[in-house]
Design a protein with these regions (language model features):
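Generic structural "secondary-structure junction" signal
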Residues: 2, 7, 11, 76, ...
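Short, charged, low-complexity patches
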Residues: 16-20, 72, 121
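N-terminal small/polar loop signature for handling phosphorylated ligands or for N-terminal nucleophile
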Residues: 29-33, 39-104
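Short, low-complexity, polar/charged sequence segments that are solvent-exposed and flexible
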Residues: 18-19, 59-63, 89, 112-115, ...
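Short, charged N-terminal helix-start/capping segments
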Residues: 1-3, 92, 96-107, 161-165
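An N-terminal, well-structured beta->alpha segment
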Residues: 1-59, 63-64, 142-169
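Glycine-rich loops and low-complexity Gly/Arg-rich segments
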Residues: 23-26, 65-68, 94-96, 117-121, ...
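Gly/Ser/Thr-enriched, mixed-charge loops and adjacent short helices
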Residues: 105-169
């Protein structure tokens, strides 16, 4: 995939904590603009920088009054499916750089309709350009909230239903 934010996790300015705090705050403003509850499901791949990125986003979202639910390590299609089925999240946030080098990482977003629209991307960019960081670096991480098991079970059940019976026997 090539959508979302991508770059070297250690050097790209848009993957550093200061920017990610602003991005988290911006996501909450975007949710409010869309009349959605600012509740976000975050998943990641196995890259070593994923938890740092996740925690910076969580701090920014919390600083703006939003809530994060952590799905842990999941493939992108699982996150998209859960966000669509649950319909309780303003967006899903996937921390991954897919097939890019291990030193890279990235962030992509989905809504309950799947990938966010071009209009959504433009709204986020506009809100981001107007946003400034204040004191969210000083805030502690909010209490970790895990993905409810039934939401993941629903995804796995859906996958199994696509397979011929006894394919995994």
């Amino acid at each position: 995939g090539t959508d979302g934010i991508r770059g070297n996790a250690s050097h790209a300015p848009y993957l550093q904590d200061d920017f990610l705090l602003i991005l988290g705050q911006t996501l909450v403003a975007w949710a409010h603009q869309s009349d959605a509850e600012p509740r976000f499901l975050i998943a990641h791949d196995s890259r070593s920088s994923s938890r740092r990125i996740q925690n910076a986003l969580r701090r920014g979202i919390a600083a703006a009054g939003g809530q994060t639910i952590i799905a842990g390590m999941l493939p992108s299609p699982a996150l998209i499916s859960i966000v669509r089925q649950a319909a309780t999240y303003a967006a899903g946030i996937m921390i991954t750089a897919s097939h890019n080098a291990a030193a890279d990482n990235g962030i992509k977003f989905c809504s309950n309709r799947g990938k966010i629209t071009t209009d959504d991307e433009q709204q986020l960019r506009l809100l981001l350009s107007k946003h400034t960081i204040t004191t969210c670096k000083l805030l502690p991480l909010p209490r970790l909230k895990q993905l409810p098991k039934h939401q993941l079970t629903s995804y796995v059940t859906g996958l199994l239903e696509l397979m011929p019976s006894r394919a995994l026997a």
